[in-house]
Amino acid sequence: MAKKKAFTPLFYLASIVFLPWWISFSVNKCLESWVTNWWNTGQSQIVLNNIQEKSLLEKFRELEELLFLDEMIKEYSETHLEEFGIGIHKETIQLITIQNENRMDTILHFSTNIIWFGILSGYSILGKEKLVILNSWAQEFLYNLSDTAKALCLLLVTEFFLGYHSPPGWEFAIRSIYNEVGVVANEQTITILVCILPVIFDTCFKYWLFRYLTSLSPSILLIYDSITE
């Protein structure tokens, strides 16, 4: 009986991690054909924002320059000029097709993310008692660690997320969020966020150390300061 009670929260933890993802993935596959059909039959006009329009124009200009360079190498003839126009036409259609696919992926990502968040929220509310048990296990585990181990864990977390080598990780995380939400990444915005977010989190973390850890466990703070120095 005790083993069963201990197994239930672990099963709940595994299900809360994988079940929302599995359901949203299944819904994504079910909606994919419907969204594709709706987009291809119901959309008579392609709507682009400034970033998407700029990206598409840059790709088109690059393609046009490459095709023009290829034709410059050959002899100019009426046949080659016709082939040049046909090549631009085909590649333009391909670029528009890719843009359509990106728009459909944006709709699917947005829909499945809403479904995933709704399932996760509902599952968390319904399993509140199991979350309390998991929280007590985590607190007990941390309580049994030595002060040195706790200080090392704090150092590992801060170095991983806020260290001098963390900007590539922040950039990857921000790009992943952009892709999941289905928004086209803006390089300037990403650069600004990579510069600002670590500073904000580092300031909040240091305030937490000064405000709470000083009174809760001065020994951990002392060990942490000694290691960082």
UniProtKB/Swiss-Prot annotation:
Question: What InterPro entries has UniProt attached to this entry?
Answer: CemA (IPR004282)
Topology in the lipid bilayer is annotated as: Multi-pass membrane protein
MF GO annotations: antiporter activity; proton transmembrane transporter activity
Keyword RNA-binding on this protein?
A: no
Quick one: a GO cellular component term? chloroplast inner membrane
Superkingdom of the source?
Answer: Eukaryota
The membrane-spanning stretches of this chain are 7-27, 107-127
Q: What is its main location?
A: plastid
Which reaction(s) does its UniProt entry say it catalyses? K(+)(in) + H(+)(out) = K(+)(out) + H(+)(in)
Query: Where does it reside?
Result: Plastid, Chloroplast inner membrane
- Keywords on this record? Antiport, Chloroplast, Hydrogen ion transport, Ion transport, Membrane, Plastid, Plastid inner membrane, Potassium, Potassium transport, Transmembrane, Transmembrane helix, Transport
- One GO BP annotation here? potassium ion transport
Chloroplast: present as a keyword of the record?
yes
Describe its function.
Contributes to K(+)/H(+) antiport activity by supporting proton efflux to control proton extrusion and homeostasis in chloroplasts in a light-dependent manner to modulate photosynthesis. Prevents excessive induction of non-photochemical quenching (NPQ) under continuous-light conditions. Indirectly promotes efficient inorganic carbon uptake into chloroplasts.
Q: Known PANTHER family for this protein? A: CHLOROPLAST ENVELOPE MEMBRANE PROTEIN, CHLOROPLAST ENVELOPE MEMBRANE PROTEIN-RELATED
Q: Which family does it belong to?
A: Belongs to the CemA family.
Q: What is this protein called?
A: Potassium/proton antiporter CemA
Lineage, highest ranks first: Eukaryota, Viridiplantae, Streptophyta, Embryophyta, Tracheophyta
